[in-house]
Amino acid sequence: KNLGVTTLPAGLVTSSTGDDTGAWTGTTGTTTTTNGSDQLTIQYTNVTGNKMIDCEGGDVANGDRVVERYFLRQPRTNPTGNAGLVLACDAGRMNSSNVITTPFNGDGNELILNVEQFKIMLGVQKTDGTMSYITPHQYKEPTNTLHNAPIIAVKVGMIVRSDKPLVGDVTPITELTLMGGVNRFAATPKYVRKSYE
């Protein structure tokens, strides 16, 4: 069963292309592909009996309830003027009444540099016990038969590019497929790109 805070502001919940609030495209509203990126928000309780670390490096005491939000944004520093987006994570805490006690609406910690696309699929349990992967938008659609089904897995995909452009007469990759979606890029500047799922 999915537990925890259910009344977060629309901009802080898991979202994908097709949602009313739009796909998450970083704090500037820009993305480097032709498709919008997703945002993943997770909630968990530390039941290990030991101290854990959240995505921003903060201590998570036993019994603490954590909310983490993964999203793309502009980097804090851009000395060359051509920095790509970064995958960032912002962490907060909530109490036993599901009230956020430590806000998590900041710009978070930078985890991975030069991420051009961030996509997620939710693995939900169907009534027959099997699992099916769907987008967050499909999951939140009230007419979908898997609306609010138990989430038992998350599939993550990213397209990452090189830090510096290629030099010389090189034909760049201008199209990559990620989780079934085609992402197109400008032909210049020329970057090495790779998709990960």
Show the residue positions of the predicted features.
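N-terminal pilin/flagellin-like segments and related low-complexity appendage regions
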Residues: 1-150, 157, 163-192
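Short, structured beta-strand segments at or near domain termini in extracellular proteins/domains
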Residues: 196-197
